[in-house]
Structures are given as C-alpha cells and as structure tokens.
Amino acid sequence: MSSIRTMVRGAYDIQKNRIQNGNRLVGNFKVKLGLPPSTKENKLDKEGKIILTNLRNSYKLLTEGVANFPRQANFKGDEVISDYTELCLVDNYLQLEGQEKNHFRRLGHTLEEYPIYTDYLEGIRGVGPAMAGVIISEIDITQAEYPSSLWKYAGLDVASDGQGRSRRKEHLVKKEYVDKKGKTEERDSITFNPFLKTKLTGVLGASFIKQPADKCKYREIYDGYKHRLENMDAHKEKSKGHRHNMAIRYMIKVFLVDLYNAWRPLEGLAVAPTYSEAKLGKTHKKAA
C-alpha cells in the first residue's frame, strides 16, 4: 500500500508543479498583453485558459515538423510566442502536462490490482482513477472499525463544541513527537488527514455535484440535503456558500458509509451499523 501512496502523492506533486508553472506562464503573457494578473493562484481564470490554448496552438505551429527542439539561433517566433525564452517556458509547461497525464494513466492501470476499485469504486459516477487512488492509498480500512472511524480520519466528525472538525485551536489535540535531540515532547495537532479531507470535500464533492441527479446517488443526496437546510429555520440565515459546504460534507459522509460497507467485506472484515441504522432503523440506498 505504501507504493501506491507514493505513486498517488507523486502524481499530485506533478500536478501542483504543473499548475504553478501554468500560472507563472499565464501571468507572464498577461503582463505582455497588458492584462491584469489573476487573483486566484490555484486555478486559471477564463482569460488564462484562453491564453494557454493560444500558447499551445502557437507552440504546435512553431515546432511542427521539427525533429529536435529548435535552437535559439534558428528560432523565428510569431505574434503569440515572439522570443526564444517564451518558447522554452511553454515547452516546460507542456512537458509537465504530459508527465502528469502519463502518471495518472499508469495509476489507473495499477488500481486494477485492488478489488475495492474493480468491484466498487470504478462503477461510481464521479469517482475517477485519481480519486480512487487517493481513497485506496490514504485509507487503511482494517483500522476503520466503524463508519464514524472514516469520518474522523477524514476530518468530517463533529468536535466537542458541536462544530464540524477543523484546524481551529479548540479542535486541536495534544500529541507526542520526538524532537531533533531525541526528546519526547508534546504539541497541538490536528486529528485528521488533511490531504484526504481536501480531496474528498474539494475534489470528489465537486465531481459528484457535476453529475446528473438521476444517475448519481450522491448528487441526489446533495440536492435533497441542501433543500432541507434552505427550509429549516435554524439554517435559513446561513449564506448559500455555508449551506453548500454543509451539503457537501453530508454527501461525502454518506459516501464514506457506503465505502465502508463495500470495502470491509471485501477484506473479510466485520461491518458495524451506523448510529442511525442501529438506533433509528434508517438505511441509505446503495450507490449506483
């Protein structure tokens, strides 16, 4: 499992590097074109995407039919890529983009060795190989005795103050660590896996709500829960964004319960009912 985790983390490291290079590249050409820089660092705005498309097209024209990368002495630019340095910057970005695609493609092949992927995750709309890789590599299902164990590990449990788990000071716990001198000390630490939480709520959640509700159970759950919040006096005053985040959180918690119920039997492990099933007799329909 450590090997696939290294592969998944490596893929996302390449992706992060590619995004950073893309932002710098677009920023450079925005300055050249006299456009204001983007305010978002983690993704491109509409103008940025158009610039990248134009750069790709220009790069293709300038390098088409050339066996080796052009040398500076022989370089002749166009109205988009006008000097050799710009050509090198675009080439670097496209190389990273290619590495990223290859890495995620190989990850998809690797996942075929895992029954939880071939028998379950692969068939769920909105869960691609990259997200399946995150789930399989970050979660040790043998350590999740209850569905709530997954919620806690993913940072989706409720803290002692009744609020959703976060990095707030009141949600931190004391954990021991060994300092540089080999001495055991204590420090305030989070209780969850931040990488997993970010991918589940930020990436998987967004993927689910892009699916049609009649073909994705989790989109249907999101819509239903958000509608309930909008019609509850206790939540009417909350912003749309707050209710959206609450619905995403709820949807992912249901997904984790379904994941638990599918994964544990595949590993020959006992399955415990959720609190709502054990105490209230409520059940969720299976994912499709």
Language model features with spans:
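A glycine-rich phosphate-binding loop feature that marks nucleotide/adenosyl-phosphate handling sites
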Residues: 126, 167-175, 275-280
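Basic, amphipathic alpha-helical segments enriched in Lys/Arg and hydrophobic/aromatic residues
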Residues: 239-275, 284-287
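Extended non-catalytic scaffold regions that mediate assembly and binding
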Residues: 39-48, 182, 188-189, 284
